């Protein structure tokens, strides 16, 4: 996939990937690659936030939807912004209380200045000691 991390902060995660290793038979980005890059951006955003709060956990994706809005036939980026404050507080509160939290995290695929894809992923964090 040849991903490159452009930014990884508590405000956003930005990943970029080239077309060549992610190409399909139509000479555009393979949908599976696009989805994987978006999921990784979303997962990384949550992982960074949990680490910053000292909430070591196992973070997994439970389900996702991916909307492909335009073909991508070149280098593209995936951007995940920090979750809304209220959603984040509820997520971390549940991890602290029950050792398990769920949150929906979005990521967008950008190509040539346009949004070319949108991910909505539901992630689950298992806190320390959760079996």
Predicted stretch roles:
Residues 1-3, 62-68, 90-92:
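Short structured motifs
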Residues 17-19, 68, 82, 125:
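Hydrophobic residues in beta-strands and at strand termini
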Residues 45-85:
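Hydrophobic beta-strand-centered segment that forms part of the acyl-chain substrate-binding groove
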Residues 1-29:
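Catalytic strand-loop segment that frames the active site of acyl-thioester-processing enzymes
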Residues 73, 83-131:
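HotDog/MaoC-like acyl-thioester-processing domains
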Residues 33-40, 63-67, 82-84, 101-109:
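Hydrophobic alpha-helical segments of small multi-pass membrane proteins
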Residues 22-49:
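A short mixed-secondary-structure module that forms the rim of ligand-binding clefts
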Residues 15, 62-64, 78, 103-105, ...:
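Hydrophobic residues positioned within well-ordered beta-strands of beta-sheet architectures
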